[in-house]
Regions:
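Carboxylate-rich, polar loop motifs that coordinate divalent cations or form catalytic acidic clusters
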Residues: 1-184
Length: 184
């Protein structure tokens, strides 16, 4: 390592440096950071070194801004997992973000979302404390997978990965690892 630079991110006089997830937009040299502590998503420009906290449009629900995991989809939509469910957010240049919040009431098996992956069909898979949920953003339908379908039902933070060669989705939990082949 030849060079290391750290950044302290502040908002309203408070320091927010606890991040649990990241995503990168190569075309724009933007790094998106999932923040804990109520401020949600941070957009960091790697060229200018400037950052901004992106409003989550739900000040009444502090947990929405407590991002545990993130997925940046092929259609440039953010899916953010939190202790209160999933937030689907589309950013628009110069306009407020389009935000939808989903929880158990909407069909997610459990509100504690530990991991989010997109499959090759554009569906989003959520690992939760009570099983897996597949979300189809085209029709907003949730399908839940739980015992006896799964050997692992309680998943862990940051224990998810998509194989770039096969498209298989892997999720780790407190009693093992499962993989999903969305094509079969």
């Amino acid at each position: 390592i030849k060079y290391v630079k750290s950044f302290i991110l502040e908002k309203d006089g408070k320091i927010y440096n606890e991040f649990h997830s990241m995503s990168y937009d190569d075309e724009a040299s933007l790094l998106y950071l999932g923040s804990r502590g109520g401020y949600g998503l941070v957009r960091f420009n790697l060229l200018t070194k400037k950052y901004e906290f992106i409003p989550m449009n739900n000040a009444g629900n502090r947990a929405v801004g407590d991002v545990l995991c993130m997925c940046y989809s092929k259609d440039s939509t953010f899916y953010l997992g939190a202790s209160s469910g999933m937030t689907q957010m589309k950013l628009h240049s110069g306009n407020p973000a389009e935000v939808r919040q989903y929880s158990r009431i909407d069909g997610i098996k459990n509100d504690m979302v530990h991991g989010i992956l997109e499959d090759s069909d554009g569906c989003v898979w959520l690992s939760t404390n009570k099983g897996l949920t597949k979300y189809n953003p085209h029709n907003r339908f949730f399908h839940n997978y739980e015992s006896p379908d799964l050997d692992v039902t309680e998943f862990s933070d940051d224990a998810y990965w998509k194989c770039p060669y096969t498209g298989k989705l892997f999720f780790g939990g407190i009693n093992g690892v499962i993989w999903v082949d969305p094509q079969n």
